[in-house]
Each structure stands twice: as C-alpha cells, then as structure tokens.
A protein has these predicted regions:
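Hydrophobic alpha-helical transmembrane segments
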Residues: 1-113, 118-121, 126-204
Length: 204
C-alpha cells in the first residue's frame, strides 16, 4: 500500500490545485484518463494480431503475443495464440479500461492512479516470486479487490454488446453466471466467460 501512496498524493495534489479552475480540472482529468486507459492500444494490438494470424505468419504472431500477455509463445500454435489473445483482451478490457474509468468516476484522479498503480504492481510481482513473495501477495490481493466490481461490470457490458458480434444477450449473461467461478481468478472468469459466450468460442 505504501508504494501506492505517492500516486494517491500526486492525484490529490492535482485535484486540489485545479478545484477552483474547472477548465484546468477538466483538461488534467481528460489527459490523465487518456494516458491511463489502455483501450486504444489494446484494440490496436488485437487488430494487429488478427491480421498477423490471418496472414499465417506464426513467427510474427509469437513475436507479438508478449505485447498482450506474459505467456511463453514459443510452444504455442496459431489457435492457442488466438485464444491467449482473446483471453488477454477480455481481462484487460476490465483492468485497463472499465476499471480506470469507474475508479475515476468514483474517486477522481487519486482513485484512478491508485488503481492503475495497483494493477501495474500486480503485473510485475503479483505472481509467485521468491524475492517479493509477501509483497506480491499483497499486490495481487489489492488488485483483486479493486477489480472486483469492474470485472462484473465488464461481464455485464459484454453481454449487453453481444449482438454486435453475433451473440445473444441472455445466453451470454446466463453463461457468465454459470461459468465465471470455474476460472482460477476471482475476476477473470466474469470477463472471459462473457467474451467466450458472445463470440461462441472456448476460452480458459
């Protein structure tokens, strides 16, 4: 938690400094949100990966996969890379986009920056690591807590948008409710189950 204090203080300082200047407040919030929310880069990586896979260039697809997730791509074939891409995009839609916007709406810049810092710490040391084991566990638990509501909101939004990709809203939501707890992550299942049902593919 102490590692996130500077982010909270910085966000609070900007918030206080711009409180009497609505124009500057709106500008700093917009710029920070644009920098924090990873939706544009996420969609770009997804489109690039789709084009690479469609071209049949497996080496290029393996080279691009680390841009989306931490899996070792060398032993993966094209269907496995495609599945890893969709799974990563599903979870990152929640972590990078929905959660950041939600926390900004709830607590302004301080809350959004703390969430982003927590998410970054989890990505860096949240997995088992002998050197940072205890710190990593705290980072992972905090990230799970901060993404609890955004993940469920992401699942609901994916169900709502399912017809845009040929899916069915009620079927997608029913699948989310039935399958989300089969995922090892307390949050990842909500996102992945929704995307799997909407796209009619198998994930996880």
């Amino acid at each position: 938690v102490g590692a996130l204090t500077p982010l909270a203080v910085a966000g609070l300082a900007v918030d206080v400094a711009t409180r009497r200047h609505p124009g500057w407040r709106a500008l700093t919030t917009a710029v920070t949100t644009w920098a924090v929310v990873g939706a544009q880069s996420l969609s770009h990586e997804g489109r690039v990966m789709a084009d690479v896979l469609a071209s049949g260039d497996l080496d290029a697809a393996r080279h691009r996969l680390p841009h989306l997730c931490g899996r070792d791509p060398e032993a993966l074939d094209a269907p496995q890379i495609a599945r890893g891409t969709v799974e990563s995009m599903a979870e990152n839609t929640s972590d990078a986009a929905v959660a950041s916007i939600l926390w900004c709406a709830v607590g302004g810049l301080p809350a959004m920056l703390v969430h982003r810092g927590s998410n970054t710490l989890d990505a860096m040391i949240g997995h088992h690591n002998d050197r940072y084991e205890n710190f990593g566990k705290v980072a992972a638990k905090l990230d799970d807590a901060l993404n609890w509501l955004p993940a469920r909101l992401t699942g609901a939004l994916a169900a709502l948008c399912a017809p845009e990709v040929g899916g069915n809203r009620s079927h997608t939501w029913a699948t989310v409710r039935a399958e989300h707890d089969h995922h090892p992550s307390p949050n990842g299942g909500w996102c992945e189950a929704a995307w799997a049902a909407a796209l009619a593919v198998q994930l996880g």
